[in-house]
Amino acid sequence: MSQKGHTRSTFSGKLGFVLSAAGASVGLGNIWRFPYLAAKYGGGIFLLVYILLAMTFGYTMIVAETSLGRMTGKNPVGAFKAFGNSGWLRFGGWINAIIPILIVPYYSVIGGWVVKYLADYALGRSSALAADGYFSAFISNGVPAEVCFVVFAALTLTIIFAGVENGIERVSKFMMPVLVVLSVIIAVYSVTRPGALEGVKYFLVPNLAHFSWMTVVAAMGQMFYSLSIAMGILITFGSYMKKDISIEGSTRNVEVFDTAIAIMAGLMIIPAVFAFSGGDPDALKAGPSLMFVTIPKVFDSMGLGTPIGILFFLLVLFAALTSSIALTESAVSTFQDELGWGRKKSTAIVGVVMLVLGSLSSLGYGPLAGVRILGMQLLDFFDFLTNSIMMPIAAITVCLLVSRVAGVGRIEQEILLSEPRFRRKRVFNAMIRFLCPFFAAIILISSVANAFGWISM
């Protein structure tokens, strides 16, 4: 369909793009998964592997997706169609476009849980939050969890309604600096607790005894999901990027921002849990149990548990919101471009999809708890489908598009529009042709194996 009357929005400049892209990258995975994996797989060794992968694999995928978006000025579907109309190109475009549509509903459910905990801390209920069974009782009680989900979704959609520059960019410019300040405050408080130093050492000092090939696989998977690769976000944001903004420079900024926040998350959580548990690394869990069960118990044991709890869940809310905004914008962009709809109509339709699929995920722990797919509750199934299967496949299609159809030369031409030379061209060329597809295949296999319990990550 034509896009009559639809003028492409843009970010105002490099800062707007970088903070928005960094906001997309900095999400719940940085806070509830990175510290756990770093502690489990050798601390400093895991960090080193993660940084090396971010500078190679992550860098290549960010540059590729951003360049495709800016080059074509399209959403993922349009970006792929710009190079042909073959079946696999249509498949590649649509899988990259559908992923955020499926992720943002259940992500908003978790965002609703964050809203609930922030409100409870603000009301001085830290002891209740730390009680055994509080979290499971909350998510299994359909109405409160559903209301919190709707509140979070409404916040996201309100920002999307405002547009790229006045909504996404403006909110990111406010939230991201505040998020950094909050992470520093909480990390300083955490590492100065009695007994916390052992946690700092456990997190930062390399432990070769814990190093194995799984360290590389785990770091690869975390980096892949953390940088918002293969979600259609970077292609969409790239299409909003002005031609005079450096793609390589912006990518470096996003890499640094995301890695710094992940490290700060480790310093916030691991020392605090160590201080609380008496140095027991088994107290560190990944996912909701860390954030909504362990952390409240840790905060309740601290002298300033309530104010730290407020700051922490405000930080988490900002991280969740910036990611949900990016996911929703990618979905809205697809409806705008492919159906020729305006922003308001596209946002409203995405909102309906969020409400329907999100309600299924939310109620899947309560009234719909008996409904399971492949033995998984509904939220877990949507997470498995998108993260473990669709995203690695989407990444492979991007690699094939760049290396086999568009050509690295086209990417270089796009990059040279805003900078004198393609500094990491050799790295990009080798990664996009050979290593990135291979790494994505490893992530696909290991993620599926982990989901079915064949390996433990």
Question: How should each PLM-predicted stretch be described?
Answer:
Residues 13-53, 235-238, 249-252, 256-259, ...:
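Transmembrane helix-boundary motif of multi-pass solute transporters/channels
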Residues 379-400, 423-457:
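A generic transmembrane alpha-helix motif of multi-pass inner-membrane proteins
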Residues 1-32, 61-66, 70-83, 87-91, ...:
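Membrane-interface "cap" regions at the ends of multi-pass membrane proteins
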Residues 2-7, 11, 169, 173-321, ...:
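Membrane-embedded translocation segments of transport machinery
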Residues 2-4, 78, 111-140, 241-244, ...:
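Helix-loop-helix connectors at the membrane interface of multi-pass transporters/channels
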Residues 38-64, 144, 390-394:
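Extracellular loop-to-transmembrane helix junctions
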Residues 5-8, 37-41, 76-95, 108-165, ...:
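Inter-helical loop and helix-membrane interface segments of multi-pass membrane transporters/permeases
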